[in-house]
UniProtKB/Swiss-Prot annotation:
PANTHER family: MACROPHAGE SCAVENGER RECEPTOR TYPES I AND II, SRCR DOMAIN-CONTAINING PROTEIN. Keywords: Coiled coil, Collagen, Disulfide bond, Endocytosis, Glycoprotein, LDL, Membrane, Phosphoprotein, Receptor, Signal-anchor, Transmembrane, Transmembrane helix. Residues 1-22, 267-347 are annotated as: Disordered. The chain crosses the membrane at residues 51-73. It is found in: Membrane. The gene is MSR1. It is a single-pass type II membrane protein. Residues 199-256 form a coiled coil. This is Macrophage scavenger receptor types I and II.
Length: 454
């Protein structure tokens, strides 16, 4: 019973120790300064510390409960052993009172029972010593729990001191987030500005490309006009040479006539013949020196007017001259008034132009009929304006695209045209400025093609 009382005293001590630990934990948590501005991370840390404290208490109770159960079981076994020893003593006394007939057998049995009880008692004593050691160990554990509580209190104090530093770090983090947000907005503004600059640069490049293409067209048109002016200059030089030749022939004829007149004047004799008819009145010459007055002669009668001669025979008709070259195409006239809506009928296609090798009649390699033979067109300076003329001559509304490098396959026969400068207003390709028919500097690998709009 004394042991049981000591055990209950130890249990009360452990309960009081646990209550003191709880009170210390509560007091430590109460010592923490209330700060409504603490962020969620600090609250979560406090919650985690509370959970760790509760787990520590549960661990202490889990260790103490088995120790208490072991002590109670040992005490119950001790009481049962005392009862069994008393019953054995009573049985031995009763057996001695009944008789001593079978003393030897009873003595042997009694000794065996006593030896068994002695061995059991030794085991129980050993077990009690072990339980005492466990109790000593439990006291060490209590001391360890007290030290851990003290350490936990120190940790809570350190946490209370760390709260303002954590708040300062939180404020710094808030400032950093604000600066990051401002940097993000500035980066977005820069991105939008760069995108606008990119769009403007693309627009400027497109405008520059369009202007360059227009300048190329103007240069091409100027080069075509220069070539036409050179051709006109050549024609004028040839005409001037012909006129000079004609003038030389006329001057030679005049010289011959003058020489004939001079020869006839030389052959005139000095014998005075009958007076001829009066000549026409000449121009008034310069006033000469007055000579001596001569003897006045008789006045002759006036002559009669002669008859008009007969008309001579007409000369033979001359040979026809060479046909001149086609003149330069004039500038387009003013735009006419809008005509009435037609019936939608397709224009009659040209009989001198065709498209070969395409997937339909609206596209293919351009071939032209000249001198009864079909030929191709070289793709040098082959542009949309020439394709527009070809498509309109075939009865289509316009041109979709032009093709080079024998896109629809190589043709056969002659290559009639090269570098066809068209204005786009001609009704057929024959009306464009064609320099010459028949090209030798181009091959069928450069045959031109076109795709018309349906």
């Amino acid at each position: 019973m004394a042991q049981w009382d000591s055990f209950t005293d130890q249990q009360e001590d452990t309960d009081s120790c646990s209550e003191s630990v709880k009170f210390d934990a509560r007091s430590n948590t109460a010592l923490l300064p209330p700060n409504p501005k603490n962020g969620p991370p600090l609250q979560e840390k406090l919650k985690s510390f509370k959970a760790a404290l509760i787990a520590l208490y549960l661990l202490v109770f889990a260790v103490l409960i088995p120790i208490i159960a072991i002590m109670a079981a040992q005490l119950l076994k001790w009481e049962m052993k005392n009862c069994t020893v008393g019953s054995i003593n009573a049985n031995s006394v009763s057996s001695s009172l009944l008789g001593r007939g079978n003393d030897s057998e009873h003595e042997v049995r009694f000794r065996e029972v006593v030896m068994e009880h002695i061995s059991k008692m030794e085991k129980r004593i050993q077990y009690i010593s072990d339980t005492e050691e466990n109790l000593v160990d439990s006291e060490h554990f209590q001391n360890f729990s007290v030290t851990t509580d003290q350490r936990f209190a120190d940790v809570l104090l350190q946490l209370s001191t760390l709260v303002p530093t954590v708040q300062g770090h939180g404020n710094a983090v808030d400032e950093i987030t604000r600066s990051l947000i401002s940097l993000n907005t500035t980066l977005l503004d820069l991105h939008l500005y760069v995108e606008t600059l990119n769009v403007k640069f693309q627009e400027n490049t497109l405008k520059g490309q369009e202007e360059i293409s227009k300048l190329k067209e103007r240069v091409h048109n100027a080069s075509a006009e220069i070539m036409s002016m050179k051709e006109e200059q050549v024609h004028l030089e040839q005409e001037i040479k012909r006129e000079v030749k004609v003038l030389n022939n006329i001057t030679n004829d005049l010289r011959l006539k003058d020489w004939e007149h001079s020869q006839t004047l030389r052959n005139i004799t000095l014998i005075q013949g009958p007076p001829g008819p009066p000549g026409e009145k000449g121009d008034r010459g310069p006033t000469g020196e007055s000579g001596p007055p001569g003897v006045p002669g008789p006045v002759g009668p006036p002559g009669l007017k002669g008859d008009r001669g007969s008309i001579g025979f007409p000369g033979s008709r001359g040979y026809p001259g060479q046909s001149g070259k086609t003149g330069r195409t004039g500038y387009p006239g003013p735009k006419g008034q809008k005509g009435e809506k037609g019936s939608g009928s397709i224009l009659t296609p040209s009989a001198t132009v065709r498209l070969v090798g395409g997937r339909g009649p609206h596209e293919g390699r351009v071939e032209i009929l000249h001198n009864g033979q079909w030929g191709t067109v070289c793709d040098d300076h082959w542009e949309l304006r020439a394709g527009q003329v070809v498509c309109r001559s075939l009865g289509y509304r316009g041109v979709k695209s032009v093709h080079k490098k024998a896109y629809f396959g190589q043709g056969t026969g002659p290559i009639w045209l090269n570098e066809v400068p068209c204005l786009g207003m001609e009704s057929s390709i024959e009306e464009c400025k064609i320099r010459q028919w028949g090209v030798r500097v181009c091959s069928h690998g450069e045959d031109a093609g076109v795709t018309c709009t349906l």
